[in-house]
C-alpha cells in the first residue's frame, strides 16, 4: 500500500505587536514544502490566507504554537475554530538541545549536531547560511504594512523551511509525512 503524502505548509505572519497587544495581522506567507508553491497575503487578503492554511494536513512554523496560531485565533476567531496538526521548529529545536550554546566541544565544527548558538530563527539562519534579514529593528516598523515587511515575512518562511528540512534530516523524519502535534484553541 502506497502511503499518501501529507500536504505540508510552512507559514509565517507579521503583525503590529506580539501576544496580547496584537490588534492587526499585516500579512501571511505560505510555502508548500512538497511542490514549492508559494502564496502571499497582504492586509486585505488575510482571511484568504487563513482559508489557504486550512488546506494543509500539517502546518510548519517557527513559534507557531506560541504566537502565530494564537494571534490568528485572536484576530479571526470565526475562521480559526477547528484543529491543526502542527510541527513547530522552535519546539523541536529546544527539545533536541535545550542547553544549545553552539560552541559546545561535544561535537566538532561542521557537525550538524552542533547546531546554532540559540533557538531563534536568526541564530538558525546564521548557522544554515541564510540570513533572516534586519527588517523591524526600528520600533515603528510594525505600525503599518509595507512591502519590505512582506519581503521579510517571505524570507522568514524560506528560512523556516530550511530549518524544518534540517531538523527532519537530523531526526530521520519524513518531511512529507512528519510527526505533528494536534493543536486546538
From Swiss-Prot:
Keywords attached to this entry: DNA replication, Exonuclease, Hydrolase, Nuclease, Viral DNA replication
Organism: Escherichia phage Phieco32 (Escherichia coli phage phi32)
Documented EC number(s): 3.1.11.-
Organism domain of life: Viruses
Lineage of source species: Viruses, Duplodnaviria, Heunggongvirae, Uroviricota, Caudoviricetes
Gene Ontology BP terms: DNA replication; viral DNA genome replication
Function in brief: Probable 3'-5' exonuclease involved in viral DNA replication.
InterPro entries the UniProt entry points to: 3'-5'_exonuclease_dom, RNaseH-like_sf, RNaseH_sf
SUPFAM superfamilies: Ribonuclease H-like (SSF53098)
Name of the protein: 3'-5' exonuclease gp74
An MF annotation (GO) of this entry: 3'-5' exonuclease activity
Disulfide pairings: none
Amino acid at each position: 500500500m502506497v502511503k499518501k503524502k501529507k500536504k505540508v505548509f510552512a507559514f509565517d505572519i507579521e503583525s503590529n505587536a506580539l501576544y496580547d497587544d496584537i490588534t492587526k495581522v499585516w500579512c501571511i506567507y505560505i510555502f508548500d514544502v512538497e511542490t514549492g508553491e508559494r502564496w502571499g497575503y497582504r492586509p486585505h487578503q488575510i482571511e484568504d490566507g487563513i482559508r489557504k492554511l486550512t488546506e494543509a494536513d500539517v502546518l510548519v512554523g517557527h513559534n507557531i504554537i506560541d504566537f502565530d496560531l494564537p494571534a490568528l485565533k485572536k484576530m479571526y476567531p470565526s475562521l480559526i475554530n477547528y484543529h491543526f496538526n502542527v510541527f513547530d521548529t522552535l519546539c523541536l529545536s529546544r527539545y533536541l538541545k535545550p542547553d544549545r550554546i553552539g560552541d559546545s566541544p561535544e561535537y566538532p565544527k561542521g557537525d550538524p549536531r552542533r547546531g546554532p548558538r540559540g533557538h531563534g530563527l536568526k541564530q538558525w539562519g546564521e548557522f544554515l547560511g541564510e540570513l533572516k534579514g534586519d527588517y523591524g529593528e526600528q520600533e515603528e516598523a510594525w505600525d503599518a504594512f509595507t512591502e519590505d515587511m512582506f519581503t521579510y515575512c517571505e524570507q522568514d518562511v524560506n528560512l523556516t523551511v530550511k530549518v524544518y528540512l534540517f531538523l527532519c534530516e537530523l531526526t530521520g523524519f519524513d518531511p512529507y509525512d512528519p510527526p505533528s502535534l494536534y493543536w486546538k484553541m
